[in-house]
Amino acid sequence: LKDWDNVTVINEDILKVDMNQLVKEYNQGRPIKVVANLPYYITTPIIMGLFENHVPISSITIMVQKEVADRMQVGPGTKDYGALSLAVQYYARPQIIANVPPNCFMPRPKVGSAVIQLVRYEEPPVQVDNEKLMFRLIRASFNQRRKTLVNGLKNSQELDFSKEEIEKAMAETGIPVNVRGEALTLAEFADLANAFNKLR
């Protein structure tokens, strides 16, 4: 690439480097497009690091394990629905562009792959007063996904709400006390986070 004057190779660990500083230095702070074939075992930390650190991004187009790509775009009530689904869908609109079968690689892997594009929202699709609280609620809801939402939140190490506070917040948002977290939409998690935020 040395003959290309519009290419800069940066030898850094993406999980440690200050991406906001790189975008500021090399792209004058304008939104960038991320295109990558990510190491499958660190896909989630990379994506969430870009989103949670509010790196100016217009889109992310990546090849990932097919199972992970599916998790990013599914909705409530499915076995693949979880914290990653909600986080990605809060920040971006996911769409699988292509499935890549194992026979496209040499040596042939044991898992399928997919190219997925995440188009960043200018504004999140839901209004939430405290993002960090919402994501703590989401993680707590799926850490013990077979438990009811009340028990999952009450037993969470990340939260310190009493059972009474949890039931009050759920009543205010119209969420049944016997529901599991895997049944809630992103909008319902946002409403619940806003209700909890008013309690403290």
Tell me what each language-model feature is.
Residues 170-178, 189-195:
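Amphipathic alpha-helical segments that form the core helices of the histone-fold
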